[in-house]
């Protein structure tokens, strides 16, 4: 294998090096690992001795005794998609033998069952008790593990320099991992990129976070000079996320002629922070690949009664009068209840202004008193049927539906609850042929976080039939929100995902990015399951 300088050349694309430090920080009785980020070209070098923690001795050694240190995804560092290559290097010493031990591990998400996400160690480095050697284990793109052992038989109490590194071969769509222990190396090849894309957790001292029983703990061992680095692949046109300037969420796409308009909420939460969504943004495209930003088209503050940082999910539709109506979720700053209101514009790129002249919301919580969740009135979706009748669905915990007047800003009939299996929030109504579909965020029994499910009907007024899952939960985040469109003969499934960085800053639960996949149907009209990928629309251009 090439020298690491060739694998990760100077000034290469998006190269990051994580030099881990340790501080004593008690949160949920867990000590966290903190790291400092700098480019490979930086001259500073850090070891564990640079930070004052109890477990570091005068020789810069961290003693591991059933202890756990972890670096959460939401800590202040860019999340690196180390798909081109990565390297982990440390000096390790085993105080006991005979038991398998994991010294350092990168946990990742593996979806072995639809909607049920189990954890698997994307990279694990430790002691293999069957071979008596140090090992590296990686998980490939198909969720299969590959373990490689190298070096001499490990002796208790002796220090070893252990270095694992991997490099992706684009032409072969395969990666080679090399393990070197005290200068003796072995290597193996596994399918796919060097590292799967997912948000995750780096852990020292355990093979699984949280001290689970038999979690491959290091019961008596030492570590020093830990260094972790990696390199991402160049961005490909059409890959996720769609927008790379800011964090975006709650997608609502609308097709007008030969152009698709994407309406999204802007996530401005700080790293690890809670929701802060002051604006709705608009982008446009003629091919779903290249996008033009039109900036802010509406803000929560445009509604006098609304809390200014709650620009929640909504949808834009074009009325019979040619105007564009933006149905949005807001927080009433007086009673803190969610409401649904509507804004209007002569142009799909705004600006939008509140449409109801009396200044009252379109939907308030007193219209849905039978909801089993508080703040039921969120996430409006509007479908204009073939006869010109507009219908709106929404709801948190329960799905509600009402007919709108042709003026688009008043109700035309009673609000009614529509039974939907496993319904959570975020409905999206669309029609294909003679069949109506409602795709929504789902809380299947015993499954978290939210997945995406759907129901279908031959009439907008039902009865509705449960169709099953559309996708798993997002790669990171406890929410997911759908948008479905047909554009230039192709169907698209759009959602948000918190596992992507923007401008060198990490995503998260409240720092999401809008993504897209192709959507297809079976011959009977049911929706085919969608895999959420980083490749996105670049896969079938």
Which positions does each model-derived feature cover?
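Extracellular, beta-strand-rich glycan-interacting domains
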Residues: 89-94, 213-233
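Carbohydrate-active catalytic/glycan-binding domains of CAZyme proteins
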Residues: 232-541
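Short surface loop/edge beta-strand patches of beta-sandwich-type extracellular domains
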Residues: 64-86, 147-153
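Flexible glycan-contacting loops in extracellular carbohydrate-active proteins
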Residues: 189-222
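Localized edge beta-strand/strand-to-loop motifs within extracellular or lumenal beta-rich domains
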Residues: 158-176
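A carbohydrate-recognition surface predominantly in extracellular/luminal proteins
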Residues: 75-96, 102, 119-124, 226
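Glycan-recognition/cleft segments
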Residues: 105-137
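Short, aromatic/His-centered strand-loop micro-motif at the edge of beta-sheets
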Residues: 136-161
């Amino acid at each position: 294998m090439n020298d690491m300088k060739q694998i990760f050349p100077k000034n290469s694309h998006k190269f990051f090096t994580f030099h881990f430090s340790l501080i004593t920080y008690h949160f949920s009785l867990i000590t966290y690992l903190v790291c400092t980020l700098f480019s490979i070209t930086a001259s500073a070098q850090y070891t564990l001795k640079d930070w004052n923690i109890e477990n570091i001795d005068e020789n810069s050694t961290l003693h591991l005794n059933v202890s756990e240190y972890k670096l959460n995804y939401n800590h202040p560092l860019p999340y690196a998609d180390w798909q081109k290559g990565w390297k982990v290097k440390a000096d390790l010493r085993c105080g006991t033998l005979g038991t398998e031990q994991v010294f350092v591990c990168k946990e990742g998400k593996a979806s072995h069952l639809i909607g049920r996400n189990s954890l698997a160690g994307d990279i694990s480095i430790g002691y293999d008790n069957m071979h008596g050697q140090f090992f590296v284990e990686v998980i490939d793109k198909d969720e299969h593990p590959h373990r490689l052992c190298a070096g001499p038989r490990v002796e208790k109490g002796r220090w070893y320099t252990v270095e694992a590194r991997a490099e992706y071969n684009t032409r072969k769509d395969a990666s080679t991992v090399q393990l070197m222990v005290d200068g003796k190396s072995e290597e193996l090849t596994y399918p796919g990129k060097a590292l799967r894309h997912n948000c995750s957790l780096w852990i020292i001292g355990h093979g699984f976070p949280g001290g689970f029983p038999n979690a491959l703990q290091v019961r008596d061992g030492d570590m020093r000079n830990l260094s972790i680095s990696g390199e991402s692949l160049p961005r490909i046109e059409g890959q996720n996320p769609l927008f790379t300037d800011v964090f975006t969420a709650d997608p609502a796409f609308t097709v007008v002629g030969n152009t698709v308009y994407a309406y999204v909420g802007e996530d401005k939460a700080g790293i690890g922070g809670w929701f802060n969504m002051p604006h709705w943004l608009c982008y446009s495209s003629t091919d779903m690949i290249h996008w033009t930003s039109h900036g802010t088209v509406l803000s929560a503050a445009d509604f006098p009664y609304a809390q200014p940082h709650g620009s929640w999910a909504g949808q834009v539709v074009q009325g019979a009068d040619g105007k564009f109506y933006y149905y949005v979720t807001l927080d009433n700053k007086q009673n803190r209840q969610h409401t649904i209101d509507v804004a209007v514009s002569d142009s799909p790129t705004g600006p939008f202004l509140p449409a109801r002249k009396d200044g009252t919301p379109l939907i308030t919580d007193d219209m849905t008193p039978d909801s089993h969740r508080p703040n039921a009135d969120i996430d409006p979706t509007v479908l204009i049927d073939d006869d010109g009748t507009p219908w709106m669905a929404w709801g948190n915990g329960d799905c509600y539906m009402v007919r709108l007047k042709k003026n688009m800003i008043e109700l035309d009939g009673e609000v009614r609850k529509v039974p939907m299996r496993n319904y959570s929030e975020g409905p999206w109504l669309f029609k294909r042929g003679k069949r109506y579909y409602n795709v929504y965020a789902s809380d299947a029994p015993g499954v978290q976080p939210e997945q995406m499910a759907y129901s279908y009907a031959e009439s907008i007024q039902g009865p509705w039939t449960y169709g099953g899952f559309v996708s798993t939960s997002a790669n990171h985040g406890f929410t997911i929100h759908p948008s479905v469109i047909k554009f230039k003969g192709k169907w698209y499934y759009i959602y948000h995902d918190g596992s992507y960085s923007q401008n060198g800053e990490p995503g998260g639960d409240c720092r999401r990015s809008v993504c897209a996949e192709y959507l297809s149907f079976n011959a009977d009209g049911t929706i085919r399951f969608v895999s959420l990928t980083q490749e996105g629309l670049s896969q079938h251009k």
